[in-house]
Amino acid sequence: LPPVPGGKPLTRPWIVVERQGRKIGIVGLVNEETPSLASPCKEAVFGPAETALREAVASLRAQGVNIVIALTHLGLNVDCELAGRVDGVDVFVGGHTHSLLSNTNPKAVGPYPIVKHSPSGEPVLVVTAASSCKLLGHIAIDFNDAGIAQRWNGEPIVLDGRNVTVPPDAKLSARLD
């Protein structure tokens, strides 16, 4: 979200975390239809995701970040399109279309992950894990020193309740059903 006129941004557009001595940027993106799908505050302004992503990647790279993850609510097709159009993003973790990606589930719409290539030819991994907290996305990625994914392995984990130790919240369960 861009700043309100004369003000500060309503949210942080990205964060930088450090893991194993590496700076990792995580960028949040939602679709421009959010105001008609949700009830954001009236000050919120939603712009083009691609523009926001390009600006975020440039800023993150200037801060020495060489692994960028886009956490999106744009839909699988948009994530895949952006993966092929925007340099500097390594992984898209997406939602919105409730698409199932899997290497083992015959109902999947594609493999987990989908591998696209950035304009500069680097691999970009796209993952999503359906909807309603029925699956938990899981992927392990080996990056080289330049932050380029070299190897990866993953598969969504079915959350079937077999090891549940906390009773379900009735109100939340009703909303998910």
Regions found by a protein language model. Name each.
Residues L1-P167, K171:
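Acidic, metal/ion-coordinating pockets
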Residues A174:
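C-terminal glycine/acidic-rich active-site capping loop/insertion
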